Amino acid sequence: MSETTGDRLRTWRAGPRLGVAYYNEYLPDPGRLADDLSLMHDAGITCIRIGESVWSKWEPSDGRFALDWLTPVLDGAAEHGIDVILGTPTYAVPRWLSRKHPELAVIRRDGHAVPWGGRQEVDYTSELFREYAERVWRAD
């Protein structure tokens, strides 16, 4: 299977892949990243999934995007022949968003709002949530 992105042609490996979720953003040490990617390559890992659940890392404050942390992971994976699935970070909203819009919280059956700090604590059907989510999806 191939796809064209810009002026580059990307060919995907045929057949099943062995992949893992990789959260380098929790321990952002360049030496660890290099070691982890080498170990994954040696173990036959062909794909990593990154980026989800860290909206606060993508957008540390309202409208300010900081995506430079992704570059070493993407470059390192490419150097090791590991494909990347870049997840969207929208199932764990940043604290600034929950403070700015407390109405986005899911309301439990008992009538209380789900507090910030877990995952999936927002109302995904909210138009306002979807506007913020789309904004982070399109960040560059």
Predicted regions and their residues:
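Boundary/entry segment of secreted carbohydrate-active catalytic domains
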Residues: T5-R32
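Short, acidic/polar
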Residues: Y26-D42, A133-A139
